[in-house]
């Protein structure tokens, strides 16, 4: 009996030791109304903006409207069991997402929860989804190239690490293909990638993930997705989750590439939320702060100086236009935020010119400083030539009386356009790009019949493989010295002679003279 008594006394003493005077304050409110994924909650007077609110049945939401007597909460997931009078509880936490290397190779939703069926993510670190972008004094100028592996972009519209380059165009013009090819091309280059899919079909996301898996690119990539079947609140949150995951590696001094596919659907989701929250509509029914929505997101992509780690986030936002109208509200907003745009055109795409980038309307504002010298040396007047060709080509449709000079410009233009064609999923190395551009700049392509240009490109890659001394020197020096240029010129003359000699019924006098190849 005494033993039992001593045991009880010990237990009571132990509980007294644990006693704390600290008061845990739990704020609980009531749902006034719920409809279309928005709950009006009363009794949460001290709620924070973007705070996570918990409801019954494990439903969560984010506080977006803080009014005098109520809080407007956008709900995540199935809210069918939430009724008027249901309880809502503050979590005292603003929206957070897991970050770190554990996110690599995973597919997560807007809340950072895995949706790939590969079990939970054992993250040790979490970070706030909404943050202020790095300040001016922490940044550094963009001067390192981000290799896309796409000849047109690397030659004419180079992208630097830390740049924001918009990809804009109608549906089905190859916008996502450019972004995915760029991710694939980062293999072995120590660049982490984040692909953010917003409002897309489940089948489209699955297809992209499959393409990344087949090319062994998921090892360094995280996919953040909110598909068309997800509520507007999830689509709204997705890009902020993506950039937060990318910022973890930025702080580690790493280079990151993030793709937002696409911000048009993101703006529509935000418009939906804003109208349901009864915020006043503006132009095209978008709320007044839709510019700030995208500017605060894209300003988080930057290049930091050495004192802050020297990392970078390069952003490729995608915008879908209607009937090629880039002067609409959202496209003009994002064009003014970003450091350049690639304008994709339907008629080029349909005519087989892929990637279908419009040379005249596309621009890269800061990337030229990041372009390697070997490519810069060969692209002096190429953009002007292509713009001139484009103008003359449309003019030549109306009449057949063309002078000799115009015919030469058109013939050269056709060959250049054929040279910059590139199949999907086949990125080029920068050295091969420099060699293609050398062939264009030194007019070796004029000897090649139009139908054989693709085979000639293949032959260049076979001839100048990674073991070739010229390839090795360009890859090392990143520029053409006088000696290297002369050496490359001689090698190309020999290559062209061998190539055309194998063509059936080839007559060199139609294209030039044999003396030019001596």
Curated annotation (Swiss-Prot):
InterPro entries: ATP_synth_asu-like_sf (IPR023366), ATP_synth_asu_C (IPR000793), ATP_synth_asu_C_sf (IPR038376), ATP_synth_F1_a_nt-bd_dom (IPR033732), ATP_synth_F1_asu (IPR005294), ATPase_a/bsu_AS (IPR020003), ATPase_F1/V1/A1_a/bsu_N (IPR004100), ATPase_F1/V1/A1_a/bsu_N_sf (IPR036121)
Keyword Transferase annotated: no
Keywords carried by this UniProt record: ATP synthesis, ATP-binding, Cell membrane, CF(1), Hydrogen ion transport, Ion transport, Membrane, Nucleotide-binding, Translocase, Transport
Binding site for ATP: 169-176
Reaction(s) catalysed by this chain's protein: ATP + H2O + 4 H(+)(in) = ADP + phosphate + 5 H(+)(out)
Membrane topology: Peripheral membrane protein
GO cellular component, one term: proton-transporting ATP synthase complex
Site (Required for activity): 362
Cell location: Cell membrane
Keyword tRNA processing included in the entry's annotation: no
Family statement: Belongs to the ATPase alpha/beta chains family.
Self-association and partners: F-type ATPases have 2 components, CF(1) - the catalytic core - and CF(0) - the membrane proton channel. CF(1) has five subunits: alpha(3), beta(3), gamma(1), delta(1), epsilon(1). CF(0) has three main subunits: a(1), b(2) and c(9-12). The alpha and beta chains form an alternating ring which encloses part of the gamma chain. CF(1) is attached to CF(0) by a central stalk formed by the gamma and epsilon chains, while a peripheral stalk is formed by the delta and b chains.
UniProt function note: Produces ATP from ADP in the presence of a proton gradient across the membrane. The alpha chain is a regulatory subunit.
Protein name in UniProt: ATP synthase subunit alpha
Organism: Mycoplasma pneumoniae (strain ATCC 29342 / M129 / Subtype 1) (Mycoplasmoides pneumoniae)
Lineage, highest ranks first: Bacteria, Bacillati, Mycoplasmatota, Mycoplasmoidales, Mycoplasmoidaceae
Gene that this sequence comes from: atpA
